[in-house]
């Protein structure tokens, strides 16, 4: 018997927020919805601070300079 393993992308293409969640779009079309309560620095940040992010590692992670916060996409899966 053979086992088929599907390699899913762990590369982010976009990040946005509402009042309670962070959303992350992935290269393969998936969208993640993550409670910002999981990340106290994001939860307590201003809208301006939350929106001041950039990708690191070609989309493998997200960095917030103002908050000194890094999140790896694979840790959200």
What are these regions (language model features)?
Residues 1-77:
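Motif-centric detector for short Cys/His coordination patterns
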